[in-house]
Amino acid sequence: MEQILKAARLEKAELNDEELALINRQTLRPLTAGEVFTFRLAACDNQVDRDFERFTEATLAEMAERFVGLPVLRDHRWSSETQTARVYAGSVESSGDGTQRLVLRCYMPRTEQTAPIIAAIESGILRECSVGLAVKRALCSICGANQRETLCKHIQGLEYDGRVCHMDLDGVADAYEISLVAVPAQPEAGVIKSKRYGGQEPPPESHPSGGAPGEDTAWQDEALLELEKNRF
């Protein structure tokens, strides 16, 4: 199942008795406030992003539950040595403009090994993160087709009868990873996704409407790619 990685941003977190109690649900012995460092990940929201995708509100709520207990890695490397923090709570926060955002609260122990990471976070040097998951459905905003089952002719970012096409990412199939990463060198870095969400290949005669012949060919070429990988 294809993985989608979305950029997230680290924020300062306050530690109180209630938060410490949530942290201690993840530990083998009770930790004190002086033993832990906490931070927040301002992750996905329900707005259309630069990839012309948005998470549904129900999916954000699912993610808030599914990511609790997952480790926070370094540079997408899966090993015990790169596990530097853990998610202890998740929630969906609303703003006045109607935006709903997934916020993951994380902790790490204060040790000699984690001291450089904590210093990098506190100084603002290390503040980028990616959140990885697989979704059950990718629904076209124009026709409603689930791209995991069949390909429609609509392309994200193109306009159809005054409406810009985007994909609604709906339902959490799996929560894979959270990873602290370096600042991306390119604006589009940090995204891994299936070009057409693992759906069926389009029939040879199928073309998106309104596009020039060269654009149609590019669309078909992209549909044949299984993954696009722009790593940090």
What is the meaning of each model-derived region?
Residues M1-P204, E215, E226, F232:
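Signature of dsDNA virion morphogenesis modules
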Residues A212-L224:
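Short linear motifs in low-complexity, proline-biased tails and propeptides
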